[in-house]
Swiss-Prot record:
Active-site residues, record numbering mapped to chain: 75 (proton acceptor)
Tree of life domain: Bacteria
Class of enzymatic activity (EC top level): hydrolase
Function statement: Nucleoside triphosphate pyrophosphatase that hydrolyzes dTTP and UTP. May have a dual role in cell division arrest and in preventing the incorporation of modified nucleotides into cellular nucleic acids.
Biological process, per Gene Ontology: nucleotide metabolic process
InterPro entries on file: ITPase-like_fam, Maf-like
Listed name of the protein: dTTP/UTP pyrophosphatase
GO cellular component: cytoplasm
Keywords assigned by UniProt, alphabetized: Cytoplasm, Hydrolase, Nucleotide metabolism
Cellular localisation: Cytoplasm
Family: Belongs to the Maf family. YhdE subfamily.
Key word Cell inner membrane present: no
Length: 198
């Protein structure tokens, strides 16, 4: 297999967290292009299926106008049981999410989709991480909501910020819950790219 260079890779996301995580393992995509797609879950769609569909849809949307590139699409979903917790639209919804997660285990699904040029191959990996929050006091809930860290976060949770202090334990991948499973992403990309590890 001929090794590609990273300027042939597009990241279908403008997430600063994901860009920083990729840089952590010395990966800098040639282009960063966010994908504007419909993120409404399908009726009775399960969280894992939704995460896979979103990652794939983001990659496909960007590759449709950039067919000669590899495209990396990523999606992170917070789920309580079968309920998908999307990005909170307002503080009222963020409060509902935080109260729902308080004292309970929940799952974070992060799917990574790599499309090769012209969609000749498609690789998808999904990482599931179990997280348990402490039971939150009213003061903690109000403090977190006032911080506005819930904005633009799946389930209203910013694990790199204040929400991190609510975590009693997690089982799985920490990098995955903040937006990108590093091990799985590295393994996918190393099949095609010269990652300059030496």
């Amino acid at each position: 297999m001929i090794e590609q260079f990273l300027n042939n890779l597009i990241l279908a996301s403008s997430s600063e967290r994901r860009i920083a995580l990729l840089k952590q393992i010395n990966i800098e995509p040639g282009l960063i292009l966010p994908a504007d797609i419909d993120e409404i879950p399908l009726r009775k769609e399960l969280p894992k299926d939704y995460s896979i569909r979103m990652a794939k849809s983001k990659a496909e949307k960007i590759q449709s106008s950039n067919p000669d590139y590899f495209v990396l699409g990523i999606d992170t979903v917070v789920a309580c049981g079968r309920r998908i917790l999307l990005k909170a639209k307002n503080i009222e919804q963020a409060e509902k999410y935080i109260r729902l997660l308080s004292g309970r285990r929940h799952r974070v699904y992060t799917s990574v989709c790599l499309l090769t040029p012209d969609r000749s191959k498609q690789h998808i990996r999904t990482v599931v991480t179990i997280v348990k929050f402490k039971r939150l006091s009213e003061r903690e809930i109000k403090y977190y909501l006032a911080s506005e860290e819930w904005k633009n976060r799946a389930g209203g949770c910013n694990m790199q910020g204040l929400a991190g202090m609510f975590v009693l334990f997690l089982r799985g991948s920490y990098s995955s819950i903040i937006g990108l499973p590093l091990h799985e992403t590295y393994c996918l990309l190393s099949n095609y790219f010269n990652l300059n590890l030496y």
